[in-house]
Amino acid sequence: MQKFILSAFVVALVAADCALKCPDGYFSFKRAPSAKNSMTGLWCVKAILSDTLISPNQAKQVCEKDGSILTSFENLDERTKLATVLRDFLSAKKLDRGGMIVDGHRLKNCETDDRTVLNAEPCRNSSTGFTTDEKHTDNTFMWKSWADTEPGQSIFEKQIESCLQLAISQFKSRTELINDVFCNYVKHPQNEGAYDLWNYGAVCGRLPEWN
C-alpha cells in the first residue's frame, strides 16, 4: 500500500512538472476543444504593442518575430482582457482611442469594389463575408463583435476595407469591438486624423509548450 501511495505521488509530481504552459507575457486562454478550434484546449495569446504604428499587412510579421501567429479572441472574456491591455497601453500614452490588428479578412471574392457583389450573399453578411486564417480559434463569437455600423465597406482606389482591428473608441457602441480597415495603410487614406483607426500592434497566438 505504501509503495502504491509513493508511486501515485511520484506520478502526480511528474504530471505537474510536465504540464502545458504558455510563455511569459502570454495569456493562457483555456478553451472548450471543438472541431471549430482544432480541438484546442489551451491557447497562448499576447497583444504585442509599440509606439510605432503598423499597417494591417505588417501584423503577421510582428507576430512571427515573437514566434507566434496572428490570432483573435474566442469569447467575451478573451476579448475583454485583450481590450484592457490595449486600453492601458493607450492610457499610458495619454490617448483615448486606437487599435490593434486581429486575424481575419474578407473572403477573396468579397475583396472587390463591385457593389453588386458586396451587396449580395455571402459578402453582405457580416458573419459570412469574412474568414480567419488561424485554426486554433473558433471565430463564431468574433462575428458577433462588430462595432456599430461595421463592417463599413469603404473603398479607396478600388481597394476595400478587408483587414480587421480590435479598437478602443470614444463611443460606447464602438469600443472593444472589431472594425474592418484598409490592409495596406498605416493611417486611413481618406482621413489620417482618425486616431481610432491607428494600429499600434497585433494580437498574436501560439500553442503552449510542455513545462
UniProtKB/Swiss-Prot annotation:
**UniProt key word Transport:** no
- Give the matching InterPro entries: C-type_lectin-like/link_sf (IPR016186), CTDL_fold (IPR016187)
Domain of life of the source: Eukaryota
Q: Which UniProt keywords apply?
A: Signal
Leader sequence residues = 1-16
**Does the record carry Signal as a key word?**
yes
Its recorded name reads C-type lectin domain-containing protein 158
> Gene of origin?
clec-158
